[in-house]
Amino acid sequence: MSSTAAPPTPHRAPTAPETPLRRVPALAQALLAYVGVRALGLLVLSLWAHRQHHGVWPVLATQWDAEYYLGIADHGYAHQLGGMDGGNNLVFFPLYPVLVKAVAAVTPGSRATTGLCLAVAASLVAAWGVHAVGDRLHGHRVGILLTVLWAALPVGLVQWMGYTESLFTALAAWALYALLTDRPLTAAWLAVLAGLTRPTGIAVAAAVTVTCLLSWRRPRALAAAALAPLGWCAYVGWVSLRLGRWDGYFAVQRTWRNELDGGMETLRRFRSLLMYDSTPELFLVLVTVTLLASAALWALSARDRQPLPLLVFTGVTLLIVLTSGGVYFPRARYLLPAFPLLLPIAVRLARAPRRHRTLILTTAVLGSAYWGAYMALVWTGPP
């Protein structure tokens, strides 16, 4: 077996290669559970918004980052760097707004409607991919639990907003699945698309490249290793050409006060929120707990000997998020695509007594519904 394929696990006997479609009953359970969790979150948001006389549609489809993506679909990208007050739309990667523009051109309704529908559709493909990875490694029960846990993340509402997280998670999940099933070129092409979707697309490319370089004697693996980063590099290079400077994309990031600082800003925020702030903002506490829990889960994933592609993807994603010196509050959302971090929980829940499993999942689902509404209607900044 090549180094790109997952070794057999003690939880299920090795079987002949199969496609996800051959496990439709388990997949149907996972997707129904996913839709149920997200529908409950949407219901709680709607009821909360009704009590506040607040519309739900703008929250989901047209505010914050969604507004920028719609602006790119309508008017294209900026031609100049601008000042240091943020607002330059070159910071946003192009695949999602290009899809919005293309699909809206051949379908009825507004581009905002198209963008939201694309995000919801992508979330279903992402949930399918999350289930496929869990099922491949540990069986259908873990696959279903992993899907539910991903749906029930505190910032899970973003999966059904006009943002790129669902599209990116779908591409990342299926790229990882392709690596686990020894299809390096498929994984590489998906990594190219992921690299055109979000800055953290480089984490998907890293997972593909590192895994494939370990199979350097195989021409397909070497080709995949070279191909995987090209999407990310292409957009970053295009921004440099557009602005006429070699550091174009990173200069744009600096206008948003977002650049790598080795984690100093993260540590400062931790210290401020956990030690000095007597009345910290509740949403920032959630972000802090999410970051700390994610680091602990990565260590647990490594101890559990998770397959290398998953460890590289989540490790690079976590490294980027923790060492960024930019805005602090969206970092829980930035980690939303890093679903393999939830695998240790899913595996242990699968072994737990049903009563304990039900209690934990119910708490997670209800908590996600509450936090989604709080994030959208009480927290005054972007998710």
Outline where the language-model segments fall.
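Membrane-lumen/periplasm interface segments of specific transmembrane helices
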Residues: 37-52, 56, 61, 205-210, ...
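Short hydrophobic/aromatic helix or loop-helix immediately within or flanking a transmembrane segment
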Residues: 63-78, 85-108, 263-267
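Loop-to-helix entry region of an early transmembrane alpha helix in multi-pass inner-membrane enzymes
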Residues: 87, 94, 98, 106-125, ...
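Transmembrane-helix signature of polytopic, membrane-embedded enzymes
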Residues: 110-114, 130-152, 312
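Transmembrane-helix motifs of polytopic, lipid-linked glycan transferases
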Residues: 117-137, 295-299
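Membrane-interface alpha helices of multi-pass inner-membrane proteins
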Residues: 151, 172-177, 185-213, 227-231, ...
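Short acidic/glycine- and proline-prone juxtamembrane loop motifs at membrane-interface regions
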Residues: 160-167, 331-332
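Signature aromatic-anchored transmembrane alpha helix within multi-pass, membrane-resident enzymes
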Residues: 225-229, 351-382
